[in-house]
Amino acid sequence: MSNSLLVCHGLRKIYREAQLETEVLKGVSFAIEPNELVAIVGSSGSGKSTLLHLLGALDEPSDGDVFFKGQKLNSMSANKQAKIRNQEIGFVYQFHHLLADFSAMENVAMPLLIGGMATDKAESKAKSILDMVGLSHRYEHRPSELSGGERQRVAFARALVNNPSIVLADEPTGNLDHKTALEIYDLMCKLNKESGTAFLVVTHDNELAAKLDRCMHMQDGNLVQVEVA
């Protein structure tokens, strides 16, 4: 367990509004190893996305702990959490969240520029990552000029540009047709082998989840089943 990349123990999340309490996560515990491809499958409202937010330090648990490379993530300062998110964790969402007025290359380079990298170096690295995701012919295209699958490829490139240890992907193929979704999952497997980056993917699609190393099922805030692919 000490060599695990990401570990959570007894994670609970309770939302309170007036006199109403809603327990979304009910004591979730598991570990992700370096370079592992893991899926979390469950229906809408089962707690999958909430869990991902806690693991990425985008929200605080009501109880329990998250450890990243042996460090307790949820007890760190906001600045330390932000540093780990920027340098160690990539994020991909159902909607690509690309900047409409910028090219694919500029969107991918943006995290590097924000981190202080020189423009020429940032653009060179962005191009190399776009090459990796099969978009060497789309450097200068804006999001409106790309297909849905190409936009998600750019989103994955942006998530990978800082060489993160893990990418957290929340329904990354939810807006795509089945054929394109399969291509995106094949891309994740390819990137995992080439870069060594671990992936934790939230999805409701069992067929797509089966393409990864391990599949965990969530139901009503509980991790109820673990399967090895």
Swiss-Prot record:
Its EC number is 7.6.2.-. Keywords: ATP-binding, Cell inner membrane, Cell membrane, Membrane, Nucleotide-binding, Translocase, Transport. It is a peripheral membrane protein. SUPFAM superfamilies: P-loop containing nucleoside triphosphate hydrolases (SSF52540). GO terms for biological process: lipoprotein localization to outer membrane; protein localization to outer membrane. The keyword Cell inner membrane applies. One of its GO terms (cellular component) is plasma membrane. ATP binds at residues 42-49. Its main location: membrane. It is found in: Cell inner membrane. It comes from the Bacteria. Coiled coil: none annotated. Gene3D superfamilies: P-loop containing nucleotide triphosphate hydrolases (3.40.50.300). GO terms for molecular function: ATP binding; ATP hydrolysis activity; transmembrane transporter activity. InterPro entries: AAA+_ATPase, ABC_transporter-like_ATP-bd, ABC_transporter-like_CS, ABC_transpr_LolD-like, LolD_lipo_ATP-bd, MacB-like_ATP-bd, P-loop_NTPase. It is an enzyme of class 7 (translocase). Belongs to the ABC transporter superfamily. Lipoprotein translocase (TC 3.A.1.125) family. The complex is composed of two ATP-binding proteins (LolD) and two transmembrane proteins (LolC and LolE). This is Lipoprotein-releasing system ATP-binding protein LolD. It comes from Photobacterium profundum (strain SS9).
